[in-house]
Amino acid sequence: TLLGGTFVDYDKQTSSGTVFGKTNVVAQKAVVNGGLRFISEEQKETTRAKMREIVAKNLPQTSASIRFTDSYPAMGPTGGNLAVLAKLDQVSKDMGQGGVAPYDPLKRGAADISFVADYTDGIDGLGTMGSGAHTPQETVNLKTMNALIQRSALLIYRLTR
């Protein structure tokens, strides 16, 4: 979320706001709200330090501040997670659905599994396929559901053996 203008009213509950300003003046206020994705606490802290450094170098006669709120914890790759992924890959191949490779951490979002990642092996991304994720235009391709459900069920079965 990015809002800027002479007057800015931001509602954290709805992640929305209203602004007023003119195009021929410099905005008096700007509010930016977003999330950081990281695979380790070290990476998170390094990134935050760099962002603080940038914010501290604001222009003369201006002020800037930055705050961070932890949300999803880091979930770095582990041997256990890669073993679960290898099982999913084999299940997918056995079902004729093709191989499954790790998704680039730079392109993924946060995952609920991150909250228990320190305590158990797991993977994310077993859900539906579609487009427009996390937007009002989000769609789900229902034709993929049966294959994904079957693949997940077989993975769970094989993990118990």
List the predicted regions and their residue ranges.
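Metal-dependent amide/peptide-bond hydrolase catalytic core
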Residues: 1-161
